[in-house]
């Protein structure tokens, strides 16, 4: 009898320890445990991390600085992959129309693309989250006016809005970031407004509203934090979209100046040589751009599947 009681006691203790272990799993650990089940998403995440590290340590990885005009040799322009330049540099992917090492240009181009995408995405995220939550909180005519402006803007393609703003502001990094933010912030406003409107009807928010406190405190403390999951999903999509928009605008000549080795500019410089057999000038930067955008989108799709309750299995 005592043995059975001890066994039951041990069994109960084991069960309580297991339950405690299950409860002690952090949300981040649970998220990663689910994320790594998708091998494609894990590979895509590895590609994104590798590209980020490559962009950060670009000066130590490439044989030539594409910003250094003194190192350019025009007689080495449009050389095929594997060409050894007059300065002794091995151009693994060849050279572009200005004699720059194409591999160096691609790595620095990835650096610029990530910078444009992350900065523009972060600014659009911040503006859209605040404006959307504010509109859902105040309601009334203010909400109607804000959302009608957003609806009108969303009726136009993002590339058209970005092109118009970039053409007005001119070439440059700051001008291009403003154009990308203007073209993308409305998506965050719409998403934040929908999530915040749903949160505002919940009991804990209504209880907070019954206490005399500022509206911004309620938004920042209760509404905005619980509206982040759908905004994070939109952010991953919009970062990839911003990178694509930057490349498109640079290709069209209204993005970064010709001295900036962005991927769009490299593709634009090599586009005219496609039919003359010098395919590498445009093809290799295009492949790098496709890999970057595809990897970010695959990671974003997995994050969406995990954060969206309707898509959870």
Please give the residue ranges for each predicted region:
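Residues marking the start of alpha-helices
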Residues: 31, 89-91, 165
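Conserved beta-strand positions that form and line the central face of beta-propeller blades
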Residues: 34, 77, 91-92, 101, ...
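N-terminal signal-anchor/first transmembrane alpha helix
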Residues: 2-9, 17-67, 149, 227
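Short, contiguous pre-domain boundary segments
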Residues: 12-23, 81-83, 87
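Hydrophobic alpha-helical transmembrane segments of membrane transport/permease proteins
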Residues: 46, 54-95, 253-261
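Short beta-turn/strand-loop junction motif enriched in small, turn-promoting residues
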Residues: 11-12, 40, 165-166
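Cytosolic-side transmembrane-helix boundaries in multi-pass membrane proteins
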Residues: 10, 16, 311-313
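Alpha-helical transmembrane segments of integral membrane proteins
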Residues: 95-313
């Amino acid at each position: 009898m005592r043995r059975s009681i001890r066994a039951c006691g041990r069994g109960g203790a084991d069960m309580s320890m297991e339950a405690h272990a299950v409860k002690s799993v952090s949300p981040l650990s649970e998220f990663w445990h689910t994320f790594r089940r998708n091998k494609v998403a894990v590979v895509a995440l590895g590609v994104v991390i590798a590209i980020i590290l490559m962009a950060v340590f670009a000066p130590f990885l490439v044989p030539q600085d594409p910003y250094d005009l003194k190192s350019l040799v025009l007689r080495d322009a449009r050389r095929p992959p594997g060409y050894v330049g007059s300065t002794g540099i091995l151009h693994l992917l060849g050279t572009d129309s200005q004699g720059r090492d194409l591999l160096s240009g691609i790595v620095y181009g990835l650096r610029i693309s990530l910078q444009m995408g992350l900065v523009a995405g972060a600014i659009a995220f911040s503006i859209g989250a605040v404006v959307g939550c504010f509109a859902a909180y105040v309601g009334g005519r203010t909400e109607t006016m804000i959302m009608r402006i957003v609806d009108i803007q969303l009726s136009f393609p993002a590339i058209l809005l970005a092109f118009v703003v970039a053409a007005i502001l001119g070439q440059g990094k700051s001008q291009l970031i403003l154009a990308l933010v203007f073209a993308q912030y409305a998506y965050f406003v719409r998403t934040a407004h929908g999530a915040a409107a749903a949160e505002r009807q919940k009991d804990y928010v209504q209880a907070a509203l019954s206490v005399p406190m500022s509206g911004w405190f309620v938004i920042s403390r209760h509404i905005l934090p619980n509206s982040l999951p759908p905004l994070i999903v939109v952010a991953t999509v919009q970062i990839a979209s911003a990178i694509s928009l930057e490349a498109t605008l640079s290709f069209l000549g209204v993005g970064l100046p010709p001295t900036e080795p962005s991927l769009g500019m490299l593709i634009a410089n090599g586009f005219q040589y496609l039919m003359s057999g010098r395919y590498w000038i445009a093809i290799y930067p295009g492949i790098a751009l496709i890999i970057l955008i595809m990897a970010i989108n695959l990671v974003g799709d997995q994050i969406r599947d995990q954060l969206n309750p309707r898509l959870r299995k």
